[in-house]
Amino acid sequence: MSLNPNAVIIANKLKGAGYSKAHIAGVLGNFQLESGFNPRVNEGGKVGAPTGVGGYGFGQWTGGRQTGLVNFAKQQKMDPGDINLQAKFLLHELEGPEKKAADYVRGAVSPEESARRFLTDFERAGVPKTKQRQEAARAIYGQLGFLDQPGQ
């Protein structure tokens, strides 16, 4: 099974920001459960523009964070459902208002611990499904060998 192309985009953005493979796998394990890496999915499965109700995008941003995504898209003159825009917004959050969560994730040593830390401090999901996120992170970790290649 190959890694979802959207997951590759997110992984490369995170690698460029200095995240390790274990950290990247933990983040991606969460997004696998949140959205299957679909940047245009609304909570409940409807695909399209953000509705403002429930989560949106690969990170399932809600409330003020979804508003932040939409405003960020306007500033960048991009579609809020664009995978590259959302990857940039993820880094924007991790380097800004969610820096504490980013630092916590970076303190983890395994994909499973990274997944748990990202869940508790960044996603803050109503239904955690911690074990499933950790299992997804472990599976994804095994598919991140491309990050070891020069130029990636």
Predicted regions and their residues:
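Short, functionally critical alpha-helical segments immediately adjacent to catalytic or ligand/cofactor-binding
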Residues: 21-38, 119
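Hydrophobic/aromatic-lined pockets within catalytic cores
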Residues: 19, 32-36, 95, 123, ...
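Residue-level detector of well-ordered alpha-helical segments, enriched
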Residues: 23-27, 57, 86, 114
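A charged, amphipathic interaction segment
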Residues: 86-144
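Extracellular cell-wall/glycan-interacting regions and their flexible linkers
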Residues: 1-28, 128-152
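Low-complexity, intrinsically disordered/propeptide-like segments
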Residues: 31, 40, 88, 147-150
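Peptidoglycan-targeting cell-wall enzymes and recognition modules
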Residues: 2-9, 16, 35-110
